[in-house]
Structure formats: C-alpha cells, structure tokens
C-alpha cells in the first residue's frame, strides 16, 4: 500500500506553522480570545490529566476503566528534547497546549500517559462523552438506529448449492451477522425516537472515532493575520504531534483478555487476512464496521472485480489454448520456417548501412509464438471482453446499490462537510443566491478561474513531459536496433541458439520494455507529488471533491505513463516506414522501426507482459516488504524494552502510519490493471488470468497490511467508489476501439482473411480452392538492390551469395512494373477490409453494450422496494412518535388549562 512520506506532505503545506501568531483559546460558547500574552499567566488554560500506565496492555479505556479511548495523540515532550533551536520547542508547546485546552473546551476529555519504552513520548488519550457525541452526531447528520429492521431477506438463489456456498462463506458462528436497523439522521430533540438500549453501545467505536476526528480536524490553535490555523492534520505535519490515530481493539494473533473487547481485529485476521482464508468470501459487514464504509466499499469492489475476472480468465485461457494447439496447423508459419521457402527469401535491411540482408527463416520461432496470439480465438476473445466489461460495470452498479442500502449510505451526500483546509481559506464574504445569507468562500469567481487555468496548464505541461519520455524511448529503440543488428551473431541459417531466439527485433523489444518500465516507476514517484500539489492549490471544498479531482489528475498522468508505449507499438510502429528505396526518418535522422513479417502483435504482447508482471512484482515489494521491514526495524530498536508490558496505544503507535490518501493508490493500481485487461486484451488473452491471480493475492495482502502492519484508519463514510466509476466506463468505451484497431492494424488477421477469400483463388491467385498456401510470398514485396540509395544501402554478407533483389513487408508493385513501388490492389483490398471490420465490430459491440446497459437497471427492483419500504416505515415511525409526543404535550396543556379554568370559576372565599 503505497504512501507518501511525512517529509513530502510537509513540503506541500501551503503555510508553515513556524510563524508567530496569536494563540487561540475557545470556550463552549466559541469565544475566541486573540490576545492572550503569555500562556503561563492564563487562568483559563486547561491541561489533560497525567496518569501512570495501569499495567493492562489490552485496555481500551482510561485508567478509571469507564471512559473509552476514542483517539490517541502522540507528542514528544519539549522539556526532554535534546535540542531547542531558537525557541522552536517553546512555540510548539504553546500551540499544543492551546490546542488541547480548546479540545477540553469543546467537551472532549483528555488523559495523558508517558511512554513505557521512551519517556520522551507522551500519549494523550481522547474520550468523547455522551453529550458531545450526540451534539456532533446531529451536526454530521449521522444515521443511527430507530428500531430493528423487520424486513425479511430473500432466501438464497443457489438452492441445492448452498452446501458449496457455505464452504466459501464466513463461519457465522465465529463472525455473527450484524443486526439490521431502520435508521434516520440523529436529532437531539428526538432522542426518544432512537433505539437507545445502552448508551455505551449506541455509538459504535468506528462512529465514535469518526466524530472525534471531526472535532480534532476543526479545533483552532492559532490566528495569523486574521487567518485561523486549526486541525490535527496540520499539527502532525508540522511536527507538533508525532501521530494521531484511533486504537485497534486487540492483538491480531490472539484474543484480548479484556471481556469488554469485541476482538474484531482478531476475527478479521483469522477469517480474512490469514492465508488459510484465501478461498473464503470477505466478511464485508465486519470490515465496514471496523474500518468504515470507505474501506468496506473498496474491498467489496475489488472482490467483485476479482469474481468477474474468473469468467474472463477462463475464456482467455481457452482462446490461448486454441491458438497453442493449432500452431502446428499454421500454414503461414510453416512457410516462414520451411528451408525452401523462408530459407530462400532474402529480406531487405531494416536500418541503414550497418544492418545486413537476412533470411526470413530466422524469424521462425517468433512466427510460431505469433500463431498462438494471432488466431481466430483472439477475435472471439476481443468481442467477448467488450461484452464482459459492460456486464461487470452494470452488475457492479447493482451490487453497489445493495451495499448503499445495507450500509445506510443512500443519502450520504447530505452529510459531507467542508474540508478544514478549505474552511481555513474562507476569507471572502458573498451572498448565497439560494439562502440570500452571507457565506464565506476562499476566493472570488475570478480567482477560481485563475486557479483552474493554472491547474489545467500544469496538468497539460506534465503530460507533455511524459510524452517526451516516451519519445526518448522511441529514439532508444531506433538507435539500439542498429546496434543489435550489427553486433548480434549473423548466422543467416537461423540454427544458432542465440540467433534462433534473440533476433534484433526481440532484443530491442525486451530491453526497451524493461527501460520503459523503469522510467514509468520513476515518473510515478514524481507525478504523485505534482498531482497532490496541484490539487492542494486548486482547493476543493469537500473531501470527495478533493479525491475526485486528484483521481482525475493521477489517472491522466498514469494513463499516458503506462499506456503510451503500448499505443506506440500497437498503432504507430511499422505503419509509416516507406519502402527500402525511400524510407521515412524520425526527426530526420533515425529510420522508422519496422515490424516483423508477422506484424507487431508479438512485440505488444511482450510489452504488456513485462509491464504488467513488473508492476505486480514491484507493487507487492512495496506493499508487503516495506511495511514489514519498517516494523521489523522498529522492533529491533525497541528490543531493550521488549520485556516490559506495553499498552495498546503504544503498540499501535509503533505500527506504520497509513498514507494521507488512504486506499487511493490501491484503487489507482487496480484501475491501471483494469486498463491493461481491457484496452489491449486482443494481443494478450492471458491478461485476465494474470490479473485474477494478482487480485486474489492483492485482497489478502491488503487485508494483512491493514490488520497487522498499519495503524487503524479513521473510519470514513463512502457511498460509492467515486470518480473511479466514470473512469472505468470511459476505459470500457475506449477498449472497444483499441481492440478493434489492434485486430485490424496490429495483427495480421485481416490480410490473411483477404488473401484466403480473394487472392488465393482466381482472378488474383493460382490456387483452385481457398487456401493459405503462398500467403507469405504474396505479402512480401520485391525490391531491386540496385535501387538502394547510398545512405540506406545494407551491408551484404557472403553467406547470402549473389542476389539482385530482396523482400520487404508491404503491398507494392515490383520493380519494372509501370507503377513500381506504388501500392498494389491487394493493399487497397486490405485497407477496405480493415476499415469495414472496425466499423462492423464497433457497431456490433456498442449495440450489445447499450442494450445490456438499458436492460440491466442500476438498482434492482428488490433493492428499490427495500429502500422505499424503509423510507416509508421510518417516516411512519417518526410520525407516530411525533404524534405521541404531541398528544402527551397536548394532554399536559389541556390539564393545565382545565386547572386554570377551575381556579378562575371557583368562588373566592370571603
């Protein structure tokens, strides 16, 4: 799970917290005192209670055993630091104390404890009492239980296969199903309407941590030039606090001895993250309960994507086996390898001067491999994948709608608050057109226009830099091909082991793919920082807006970075090369690359294999080894105190912090993989299989990291997968075009079909029946050696003997023809067939896609009914409760009125 270092995030802070400013103290009335003078002289200053560790390592409570720890703040005691440069420590202490004082003023309760292993560290435990939870639950529009849900779930559709699905499902005796409730946004004045059996259990730990984090993110601690500074994120980034996190509930390897601990972390590790559970379904409800909806929806999506990949992988393997089993029947490959056909065809040099003439049969092995991938099965698989991706997206929408209902996120958009970073910049006052009330915004319409323009320009500039790197790879390919052509063994018979498997084209393709992969990894590191800086400057209002904006920028960068080399090989290489007598030069110096006689499809397959495989290996190294090694190093440094009993908060502190963007990079990794699986699948039918194996491991690796290597994430709400959904839809539409063009222009399928149906028989051919015999000879044009220009004339070798002509891959008239070296009739037939194929394939697949999209509703009828039923019952329940309250109140009022009337009518005593 990739993350950015604290130093990187520090550099991206737009304002430093080292500036002098007024320390801010707040009371419950939100009064801000800007001029406090010396903090030590303030009687209003409040500090957390210091308590010694009580020796209970699994405790999740304050020392009193009653107040639950909802969040932990960690700082290094300034009085015990070794250095104090220019009063920096004193400034940090003042800000921290002001911040903690304001937390107490907001109703939070704090308790401080020194570290057991390092007495410089102080852990501040934060508890939110009932009144604070209720107040902010209403502010945040958090949905809470009204009454148990009495709607019955539909029985399983698998019927007799229940025994099989039961094996794959989570054991309900271990992870008990959560009770479902009707819910509504919490309101304090309707507290009696809610299902409050136990106040301590009404707000679950994830909700408590979410509320506390909301408060921590908005409490002020300093004012500089009338601009407030607030929030725990800024304090952590500036080093005032070393960490801030909610607690895991127990150790992951064994259950807690504390009877009040739910042991959810242990259950997640045992039934989800452990390798022995790799075949089981994910406990999504428990994941959502422990980590929040945002983490839950990611694993739900990844699991569903992986399930759908199973079908694609099966069909892909079938198409691969079809090509593999039929490669011995590949007539054109036999002609390439035949000593009397391919062994006697002299091919023209593919570069100037240094490149030799060569015999066609040295490409025998590559032609055999090409038969596996360039077969009829490839066409079938490309059409299938065009339909598969639509089915996946449509069925995922339905599954997502079910999760929205089950997890109470149907109307989540009403809950989201502005980001603290946005609120801190709101200095301009405008009139809201809807409410006609004053509101603060960070910049005017003109300022917003300038920011958007600058951000768009920056994105465009960096995309151009990526394209420049791709051009550099192309220049490398053009240059190194000449070197390999001159240096590799020149055994023209193709029997030397090196020459047999390592042709100049193959060597160039492999080395260029490896270098391209290395450059991609380097550029990724740079572009991550750039995209975050641009998005921070753009200043989106909500966290969803921020993530969606960053998502689009990162995807644009990654799209160009990962796919540009594949697009070059698929659609540009070998397409604009001219012919030996008049070659086309790149940048006026480098002669354009040519494809093998069988086309560039095998090279595209090689590129995809190296990038997909290398990316998977590199990501696993980053995701598994790095956190494990960092934690191992941390344990090694703490070995001196290993015999001491350490509390839960200190154990969690020594875990790795999650990156600021959470699972953003996990989504990005999977979407890039989704692009490889769909955009170029016509050249590599095994891509879904590789993706399937990777994702099965990815789910468990991510689960293992979250439960064992990382601190607990702050639970967050999420309704869907955000901007990734339209990105996948865009990829799905583009994939139809790319696969149609790969089959038409990159593979040799269309020229073979044209030859088989038109040019193998009269009037163009000499055969009496449709056949592929003679295809190679028909697709290689003749060039007269004497027509070479001095610049491009090849380097002949004595092994070839005397020859006056050579062959090259194109459809042109031979020398001596009235239209010598012009495109012949075969060329125009092939072009017409390619264009017709693209039009037909696109229209057929798009028609099927649109029909499927129309036929499959985004929300199932049953889910719609359940949502409407719950809304109806919720409104009915609230209405009934409201009537009861009204009746009760009216009864009280009526009694008082009757009593007043009686008092007025009663005769006064004389």
Curated annotation (Swiss-Prot):
Disulfide bonds: 330-371, 337-364, 348-806, 351-355, 595-600
Subcellular location as annotated: Cell membrane
Any single Gene Ontology cellular-component annotation: cell surface
Binding site for Ca(2+): 623, 666, 669
Induction conditions: (Microbial infection) Expression is induced by SARS coronavirus-2/SARS-CoV-2 spike protein.
Glycan-carrying positions: 329, 361, 493, 777, 790, 802
Gene Ontology biological process terms, A to Z: activation of blood coagulation via clotting cascade; bleb assembly; blood coagulation; calcium activated phosphatidylcholine scrambling; calcium activated phosphatidylserine scrambling; calcium ion transmembrane transport; chloride transmembrane transport; chloride transport
Chief site of localization: membrane
Catalytic activity: a 1,2-diacyl-sn-glycero-3-phospho-L-serine(in) = a 1,2-diacyl-sn-glycero-3-phospho-L-serine(out); a beta-D-galactosyl-(1<->1')-N-acylsphing-4-enine(out) = a beta-D-galactosyl-(1<->1')-N-acylsphing-4-enine(in); a 1,2-diacyl-sn-glycero-3-phosphocholine(in) = a 1,2-diacyl-sn-glycero-3-phosphocholine(out)
Expression across tissues: Expressed in embryonic stem cell, fetal liver, retina, chronic myologenous leukemia and intestinal cancer.
Cytoplasmic compartment residues: 1-300, 397-455, 531-551, 622-663, 706-722, 858-910
Assigned keywords, A-Z: Calcium, Cell membrane, Chloride, Chloride channel, Disulfide bond, Glycoprotein, Host-virus interaction, Ion channel, Ion transport, Lipid transport, Membrane, Metal-binding, Transmembrane, Transmembrane helix, Transport, Voltage-gated channel
Membrane association type: Multi-pass membrane protein
Transmembrane residue ranges: 301-321, 376-396, 456-476, 510-530, 552-572, 602-621, 664-684, 685-705, 723-743, 837-857
GO MF annotation, one: phospholipid scramblase activity
Protein activity control: Exhibits synergistic gating by Ca(2+) and voltage. Inhibited by some non-specific cation channel blockers such as: ruthenium red, 2-aminoethyl diphenylborinate (2APB), gadolinium and cadmium ions.
Superkingdom field: Eukaryota
Family matches, as Pfam families: Anoct_dimer (PF16178), Anoctamin (PF04547)
Residue intervals on the Extracellular side: 322-375, 477-509, 573-601, 744-836
Further information: The term 'anoctamin' was coined because these channels are anion selective and are predicted to have eight (OCT) transmembrane segments. There is some dissatisfaction in the field with the Ano nomenclature because it is not certain that all the members of this family are anion channels or have the 8-transmembrane topology.
Disease: Scott syndrome: A mild bleeding disorder due to impaired surface exposure of procoagulant phosphatidylserine (PS) on platelets and other blood cells, following activation with Ca(2+)-elevating agents.
Subunit structure: Homodimer.
Biological function: Small-conductance calcium-activated nonselective cation (SCAN) channel which acts as a regulator of phospholipid scrambling in platelets and osteoblasts. Phospholipid scrambling results in surface exposure of phosphatidylserine which in platelets is essential to trigger the clotting system whereas in osteoblasts is essential for the deposition of hydroxyapatite during bone mineralization. Has calcium-dependent phospholipid scramblase activity; scrambles phosphatidylserine, phosphatidylcholine and galactosylceramide. (Microbial infection) Upon SARS coronavirus-2/SARS-CoV-2 infection, is activated by spike protein which increases the amplitude of spontaneous Ca(2+) signals and is required for spike-mediated syncytia.
Family: Belongs to the anoctamin family.
Protein name, per record: Anoctamin-6
Organism for this UniProt entry: Homo sapiens
Lineage: Eukaryota, Metazoa, Chordata, Craniata, Vertebrata
């Amino acid at each position: 799970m990739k993350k950015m270092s604290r130093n990187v995030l520090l550099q991206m802070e737009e304002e430093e917290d080292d500036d002098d400013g007024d320390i801010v103290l707040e009371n419950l009335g939100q009064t801000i005192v800007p001029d406090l003078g010396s903090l030590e002289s303030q009687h209003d200053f409040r500090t957390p209670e210091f308590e010694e560790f009580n020796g209970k390592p699994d405790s999740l409570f304050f020392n009193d055993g009653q107040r639950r720890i909802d969040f932990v703040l960690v700082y290094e005691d300034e009085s015990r630091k070794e250095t104090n440069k220019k009063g920096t420590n004193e400034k940090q202490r003042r800000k921290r104390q002001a911040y903690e004082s304001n937390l107490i003023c907001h109703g939070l309760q704090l308790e401080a404890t020194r570290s057991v292993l390092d007495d410089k560290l102080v852990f501040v435990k934060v508890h939110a009492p009932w009144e604070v939870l209720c107040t902010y639950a209403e502010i945040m529009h958090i949905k809470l239980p009204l009454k148990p849900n009495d709607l019955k779930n539909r029985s399983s559709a698998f019927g007799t296969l229940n025994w099989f699905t039961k094996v794959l499902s989570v054991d309900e005796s271990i992870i008990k199903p959560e009770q479902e409730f009707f819910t509504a946004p919490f309101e304090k004045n309707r507290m009696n309407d809610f299902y409050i059996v136990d106040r301590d259990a009404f707000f679950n730990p994830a909700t408590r941590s979410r509320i506390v984090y909301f408060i921590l993110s908005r409490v002020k601690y300093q004012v500089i030039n009338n601009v407030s500074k607030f929030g725990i994120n800024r304090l952590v980034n500036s080093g005032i606090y070393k960490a801030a996190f909610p607690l895991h509930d127990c150790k992951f390897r064994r259950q807690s001895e504390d009877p009040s601990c739910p042991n959810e972390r242990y259950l997640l590790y045992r039934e989800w993250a452990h390798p022995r559970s790799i075949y089981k379904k994910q406990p999504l409800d428990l994941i959502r309960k422990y980590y929040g909806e945002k983490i839950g929806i990611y694993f739900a999506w990844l699991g569903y994507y992986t399930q759908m990949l199973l079908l694609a992988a099966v069909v892909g393997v079938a198409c691969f086996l079809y090509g593999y089993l039929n490669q011995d029947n590949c007539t054109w490959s036999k002609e390439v390898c035949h000593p009397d056909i391919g062994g006697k065809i002299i091919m023209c040099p593919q570069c100037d001067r240094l490149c030799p003439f060569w015999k066609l049969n040295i490409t025998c092995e590559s032609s055999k491999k090409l038969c596996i991938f360039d077969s009829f099965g490839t066409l079938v698989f490309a059409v299938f994948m065009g339909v598969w991706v639509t089915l996946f997206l449509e069925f995922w929408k339905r599954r997502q709608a079910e999760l929205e209902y089950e997890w109470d996120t149907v109307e989540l958009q009403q809950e989201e608050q502005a980001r603290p970073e946005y609120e801190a910049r709101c200095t301009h006052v405008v009139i809201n057109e809807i409410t006609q009330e004053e509101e603060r915004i960070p910049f005017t319409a003109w300022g917003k226009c300038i920011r958007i323009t600058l951000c768009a320009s920056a994105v465009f500039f960096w995309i151009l830099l990526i394209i420049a790197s791709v051009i550099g790879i192309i220049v490398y390919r053009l240059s190194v091909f000449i070197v390999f052509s001159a240096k590799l063994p020149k055994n023209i018979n193709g029997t030397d082991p090196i020459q047999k498997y390592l042709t100049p084209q193959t060597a160039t393709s492999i080395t260029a793919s490896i270098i391209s992969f290395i450059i991609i990894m380097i550029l990724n590191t740079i572009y991550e920082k750039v995209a975050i800086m641009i998005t921070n400057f753009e200043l989106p209002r909500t966290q969803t807006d921020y993530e969606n904006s960053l998502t689009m920028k990162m995807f644009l960068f990654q799209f160009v970075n990962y796919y540009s080399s594949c697009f070059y090989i698929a659609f540009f290489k070998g397409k604009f090369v001219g012919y030996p007598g008049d070659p086309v030069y790149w940048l006026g110096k480098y002669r354009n690359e040519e494809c093998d006689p069988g086309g560039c499809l095998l090279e595209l397959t090689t590129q995809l294999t190296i990038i997909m495989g290398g990316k998977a290996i590199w990501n696993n190294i980053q995701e598994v080894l790095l956190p494990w090694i960092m934690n191992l190093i941390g344990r090694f440094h703490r070995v001196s105190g290993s015999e001491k009993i350490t509390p839960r908060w200190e154990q969690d502190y020594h875990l790795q912090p999650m990156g600021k963007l959470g699972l953003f990079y996990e989504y990005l990794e999977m979407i890039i993989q989704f692009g490889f699986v769909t955009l170029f699948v016509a050249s590599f039918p095994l891509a879904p299989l590789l993706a399937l194996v990777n994702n099965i491991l990815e789910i468990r690796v991510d689960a293992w990291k979250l439960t064992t290597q990382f601190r607990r994430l702050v639970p967050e709400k999420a309704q869907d997968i955000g901007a990734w959904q339209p990105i996948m839809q865009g990829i799905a539409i583009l994939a139809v075009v790319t696969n149609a063009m790969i089959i038409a222009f990159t593979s040799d399928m269309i020229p073979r079909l044209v030859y088989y149906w038109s040019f193998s028989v009269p009037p163009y051919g000499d055969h009496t029946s449709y056949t592929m015999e003679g295809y190679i000879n028909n697709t290689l044009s003749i060039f007269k050696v004497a027509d070479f220009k001095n610049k491009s004339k090849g380097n002949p070798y004595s092994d070839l003997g005397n020859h006056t002509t050579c062959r090259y891959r194109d459809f042109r008239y031979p020398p001596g023809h009235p239209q010598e070296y012009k495109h012949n009739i075969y060329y125009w037939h092939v072009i017409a067939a390619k264009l017709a194929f693209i039009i037909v394939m696109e229209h057929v697949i798009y028609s099927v896609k649109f029909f499927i999209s129309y036929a499959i509703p985004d929300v199932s009828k049953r889910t719609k009914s359940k949502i409407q039923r719950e809304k109806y019952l919720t409104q009915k329940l609230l209405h009934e409760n409201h009537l009861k309250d009204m009746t009760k109140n009216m009864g009280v009022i009526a009694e008082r009125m009757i009593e007043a009337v009686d008092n007025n009518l009663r005769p006064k005593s004389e």
